[in-house]
A protein has these predicted regions:
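Bacterial N-terminal signal peptides that target proteins for export
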Residues: 3-22
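Bacterial N-terminal signal peptides
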Residues: 20-31
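C-terminal cap/linker of serine protease catalytic domains
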Residues: 36-46, 154, 205, 209-250
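A conserved glycine-rich beta-strand in the N-terminal activation segment of trypsin-fold
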Residues: 37-42, 59-91, 112-115, 137, ...
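Flexible, gly/ser-rich surface segments that form the specificity/activation loops bordering the active-site cleft
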Residues: 39, 71, 97, 139-185, ...
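Conserved active-site neighborhood of the chymotrypsin/trypsin-like protease fold
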Residues: 59-60, 82-164, 246-249
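Catalytic nucleophile loop of clan PA
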Residues: 79, 192-213
Length: 250
């Protein structure tokens, strides 16, 4: 890229006078950005206990592993969702992760494994609900729609190696006709998302849930290009309502 530097000697004195003010403004701006960007540790602490690894076993496939190569079932992520309390835990994940599974395990931060079963599934929105007997702390749901440009973070089982934490912004809301699901209402984000992230949590800076990670746009294989999509919280609630209509009880 070509850069052209313009030098005007008549402005030298004015520039010298304005420089301290300019520097002060920059310092104020940078300190403000640091305050916003520094929410990461608090966001992580608020949500980490409510996000689990999901490891399905598919017929004819080995157990999930790094990168889910051919012949290995894809690893995924799950969100402990606040449904009926006191009877185990309900875990939200992407339907495409568990739809073919003959066995499902969820793994917590300590590495403990728990047998899970599909309690309800909605292929049209790519939402599934698992149930485990173990009680985990549910995630807190956000109120209202996320604002475009607001800071968000993703807690996901990237490449099947464990829960990781990435942050970005809300790039857009209300995305539909993207081509992943029959019924779509996505929150778009540039927070890094990779294979294994499906079913992961997209949260606000306060750790409250705004969506479930579902898909990415990319030109090459499964490489993150910063155009990533999460099923919106209203769409998740629609999916749960549809399951209830079909007789699923929570």
């Amino acid at each position: 890229m070509r850069t052209k530097i313009v030098c005007d000697s008549t402005m030298t004195g004015i520039t010298a006078l304005l420089r301290p003010l300019y520097v002060a403004i920059l310092l104020l701006m940078s300190s403000g950005f640091d305050a916003v960007a520094d929410h990461g540790p608090q966001t992580w602490q608020a949500a980490k206990q409510s996000v689990l690894l999901v490891e399905p076993t598919w017929p004819g496939y080995a157990r999930p592993g790094f990168g889910a190569p051919p012949g290995v079932a894809p690893a995924g992520t799950g969100i402990v969702y606040p449904l009926r309390a006191g009877i185990g835990s309900y875990i939200l994940t992407a339907a495409h992760v568990v739809a073919k599974a003959v066995n499902i395990e969820v793994v917590d931060a300590a590495g403990s494994r728990y047998r899970a079963r599909v309690h309800g599934i909605d292929h049209s929105r790519d939402v599934a609900v698992l149930h485990v007997d173990q009680v985990f702390p549910p995630i807190t749901l956000a109120d209202g729609d996320p604002a475009t440009g607001s800071h968000v973070c993703a807690l996901v089982n990237a490449f099947g190696i464990g829960i990781s934490f990435t942050c970005g912004v809300v790039s857009a809301t209300g995305r539909s006709n993207v081509g992943f699901n029959e019924k779509e209402d996505f929150v778009q984000t540039d927070a890094a998302v990779n294979p294994g992230a499906s079913g992961g949590a997209l949260v606000r800076a306060d750790g409250q849930l705004i969506g479930m990670i579902d898909g990415i746009f990319t030109k090459e294989a499964d490489i993150d290009a910063g155009v990533n999509f999460a099923v919106s919280l209203p769409m998740i609630e629609q999916s749960l309502d549809a399951m209830r209509v079909d007789g699923v009880q929570f």
